[in-house]
C-alpha cells in the first residue's frame, strides 16, 4: 500500500472515533433528560392516576391454538400512579400495577412512561399519544426475578380518561402480546 492509502485509512478511522464521541455525548444528554423527567414527575406531579387492566391478546399468528385456548386474556388487577404534562404537552407518568398474566398468575410492573401527545381536533380534550415505558416486572414462570422492560406505548384519550396500550414483542409461542389498560387521571 502506498502512503496515501494509509493516510486515507487513518482519517477514516479518526472521523469514526470522533463520531462515536458525539454519540456518547448525546447519550449522556439523553440520560440526563430522562433522569430529570423522572425526578420532576416524582417531585411535582399534577395528577394521580388509577390504572385498570382491560385486555391481553396473544397474536394468533404467533401461537399454537392449543396454547392460546389455555391463556388468560382478561388481566384483572389495578394500579396507581402519578403524572404530569410538560410545557410541550407531552405526558410523563410513574406507575405501579399488578394484573393476572397469561397463566392467571399475578404480575407486578412498575416504571416510567412518556408519550408525545397530539390534540388533532378542535376539542382539546381529545388526545393521541405515542411513546415508551421503561420499568421492571416479575413473572411467576421466571420465579419472580425482576426483569427490565422497555416497551412502546400508544394511547387515545378524552379528558381524564385514557386507553393506553403496549405490544410485547417475541418469538413463536412466546411474547407477541398486546396489553391495554384504562388510565383515569385525578
From Swiss-Prot:
<dbReference type="InterPro" id="IPR009746">
    <property type="entry name" value="LipidA_acyl_PagP"/>
</dbReference>
<keyword id="KW-0998">Cell outer membrane</keyword>
<dbReference type="GO" id="GO:0016416">
    <property type="term" value="F:O-palmitoyltransferase activity"/>
</dbReference>
<dbReference type="GO" id="GO:0009245">
    <property type="term" value="P:lipid A biosynthetic process"/>
</dbReference>
<keyword id="KW-0732">Signal</keyword>
<keyword id="KW-0472">Membrane</keyword>
<feature type="signal peptide">
    <location>
        <begin position="1"/>
        <end position="25"/>
    </location>
</feature>
<protein>
    <recommendedName>
        <fullName>Lipid A palmitoyltransferase PagP</fullName>
        <ecNumber>2.3.1.251</ecNumber>
    </recommendedName>
</protein>
<keyword id="KW-0012">Acyltransferase</keyword>
<feature type="site" description="Role in lipopolysaccharide recognition">
    <location>
        <position position="67"/>
    </location>
</feature>
<dbReference type="InterPro" id="IPR011250">
    <property type="entry name" value="OMP/PagP_b-brl"/>
</dbReference>
<comment type="similarity">
    <text>Belongs to the lipid A palmitoyltransferase family.</text>
</comment>
<feature type="site" description="Role in the phospholipid gating">
    <location>
        <position position="172"/>
    </location>
</feature>
<feature type="active site">
    <location>
        <position position="58"/>
    </location>
</feature>
<feature type="active site">
    <location>
        <position position="101"/>
    </location>
</feature>
<dbReference type="Pfam" id="PF07017">
    <property type="entry name" value="PagP"/>
</dbReference>
<comment type="function">
    <text>Transfers a palmitate residue from the sn-1 position of a phospholipid to the N-linked hydroxymyristate on the proximal unit of lipid A or its precursors.</text>
</comment>
<comment type="subunit">
    <text>Homodimer.</text>
</comment>
<feature type="active site">
    <location>
        <position position="102"/>
    </location>
</feature>
<keyword id="KW-0808">Transferase</keyword>
<dbReference type="GO" id="GO:0009279">
    <property type="term" value="C:cell outer membrane"/>
</dbReference>
Amino acid at each position: 500500500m502506498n502512503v496515501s492509502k494509509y493516510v486515507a485509512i487513518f482519517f477514516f478511522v479518526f472521523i469514526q472515533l470522533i463520531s462515536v464521541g458525539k454519540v456518547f455525548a448525546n447519550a449522556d444528554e439523553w440520560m440526563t433528560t430522562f433522569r430529570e423527567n423522572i425526578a420532576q414527575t416524582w417531585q411535582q406531579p399534577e395528577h394521580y392516576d388509577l390504572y385498570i387492566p382491560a385486555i391481553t391478546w396473544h397474536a394468533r399468528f404467533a401461537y399454537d391454538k392449543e396454547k392460546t385456548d389455555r391463556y388468560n386474556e382478561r388481566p384483572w388487577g389495578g394500579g396507581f400512579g402519578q403524572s404530569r404534562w410538560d410545557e410541550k404537552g407531552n405526558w410523563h407518568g410513574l406507575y405501579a400495577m399488578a394484573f393476572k398474566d397469561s397463566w392467571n398468575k399475578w404480575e407486578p410492573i412498575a416504571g416510567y412512561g412518556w408519550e408525545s401527545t397530539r390534540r388533532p381536533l378542535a376539542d382539546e380534550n381529545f388526545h393521541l399519544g405515542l411513546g415508551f415505558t421503561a420499568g421492571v416486572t416479575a413473572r411467576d414462570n421466571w420465579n419472580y426475578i425482576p426483569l427490565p422492560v422497555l416497551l412502546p406505548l400508544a394511547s387515545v384519550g378524552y379528558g381524564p380518561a385514557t386507553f393506553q396500550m403496549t405490544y410485547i414483542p417475541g418469538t413463536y409461542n412466546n411474547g407477541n402480546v398486546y396489553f391495554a389498560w384504562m388510565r383515569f387521571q385525578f
